[in-house]
Amino acid sequence: MKYVGAHVSAVGGVENAPVNAHEIGAKAFALFTRNQRQWKSQPLKADSIHLFKERCEAYGYDPGCILPHDSYLINLGNPDAEGLQKSRDAFLDEMTRCEQLGLKMLNFHPGSHLGKMEVDTCLSRIAESINITLAQTSGVCAVIENTAGQGSNLGYTFEQIAYIINEVEDKSRVGVCLDTAHTLAAGYDIKTPEGFAETFRHFDEVVGFSYLRGMHLNDSKKELGSRVDRHESIGKGLMGLDTFRMIMVDPRFDNMPLILETPDEALWPEEIQLLYKQLKS
């Protein structure tokens, strides 16, 4: 079964996210469990936690179809000691919040070397940050999102993601989320049937489908290999609808959250329906 949804607002409290997801016809959703633009946030309130769980159950959202995203400020590979510690503290808080909410995954961008360290050194630092956090928590999988490779951001090749996973001690608690726009921008052709087949053959060989926990479904404003991260509404970018049809009919992407992060939120109900229509085409 395909679980399509979007990254919905949790303004006013995390308990509002499942309501917002239900209202757009989503079968999955993503959210921020705290303010993504601040280093520190107020702890989750007991009534918010209770309502979140109650509403998820009422609307049929199993933890396996909810993919929370961490703060954009966090850089688990930060070459600066102070910045690294702030990132690790914030990541631990994010992971703890997921635990409190009964969630099973936390999606994050791996990190950036900021032009101050070697790539492999930064990748090892990211893995070390994950290990430190997993040792202090339980039950939540650290889900690495591939990036477009913009600036000094790492995690844009499958080899870099595999490098991090290889150094994570608890393999049962690390996974991957593939963003379609990032994948294209990083140089993987997923627009044509041939390119799509080769990209995911390569992913399976280097990383392994056993690690895939979810996807972000975004069309792209930028071309193949641009290394620029710019999302577009489904079917309105350079990717075209064929990519998303191939994902929707491929059983390898069943039973995981498929999350829209497209720029026009007003189109989300329409985009969700459009994606489900691909199953019948």
From Swiss-Prot:
Keyword annotations from UniProtKB, A to Z: DNA damage, DNA repair, Endonuclease, Hydrolase, Metal-binding, Nuclease, Zinc
Binding residue positions for Zn(2+) 3: H182, D229, H231
InterPro entries: AP_endonuc_2, AP_endonuc_F2_Zn_BS, Xyl_isomerase-like_sf, Xyl_isomerase-like_TIM-brl
EC number: 3.1.21.2
Chain positions recorded as Zn(2+) 2 binding sites: E145, D179, H216, E261
Pfam family, one: AP_endonuc_2
Amino acids binding Zn(2+) 1: H69, H109, E145
Biological process terms in GO annotation: base-excision repair
GO MF terms, alphabetically ordered: deoxyribonuclease IV (phage-T4-induced) activity; DNA binding; DNA-(apurinic or apyrimidinic site) endonuclease activity; phosphoric diester hydrolase activity; zinc ion binding
CDD domains membership: AP2Ec (cd00019)
Tagged with keyword Signal: no
Domain of life according to the entry: Bacteria
Enzyme class: hydrolase
Cofactors, names only: Zn(2+)
Function: Endonuclease IV plays a role in DNA repair. It cleaves phosphodiester bonds at apurinic or apyrimidinic (AP) sites, generating a 3'-hydroxyl group and a 5'-terminal sugar phosphate.
Entry-linked NCBIfam families: nfo, PRK01060.1-4
Family: Belongs to the AP endonuclease 2 family.
Protein name: Probable endonuclease 4
